[in-house]
């Protein structure tokens, strides 16, 4: 009859068997690598003003020590000029970095707007990578979706175990 749905009913993992995995995306590592990549640009920009050296800093933060602290104001301006505009989902613009200075040291961190934009980009890329790797295996009807701010839910029918699923995805998605 026409009133009956024509599509097939998708059986869940409980009825069909398969693997369920909740993967966490390491966003803090992305922030840290962004700051790592910022160092050569900052160093080269400040080199003509005064010699600089990198100082130990928490992950996701870059600290640069000026050899000549009297040039702090100029150094801060040069560093702020390295900032790029950020366009977020809301369309609000802002700078990608926060720059501050004290006692001859410049501290650079990612702005909240850049962290939000980076989170979105990283999660989208991670979802695409996981989806592509699972599709390569030819599994039918996998569920791959974002869950919360930094997690990806992966459910694949027909796969024997979570270990097998991890092997398909790989350790660095």
Predicted features and spans:
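A structural signal for conserved, well-ordered secondary-structure elements
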Residues: 1-173
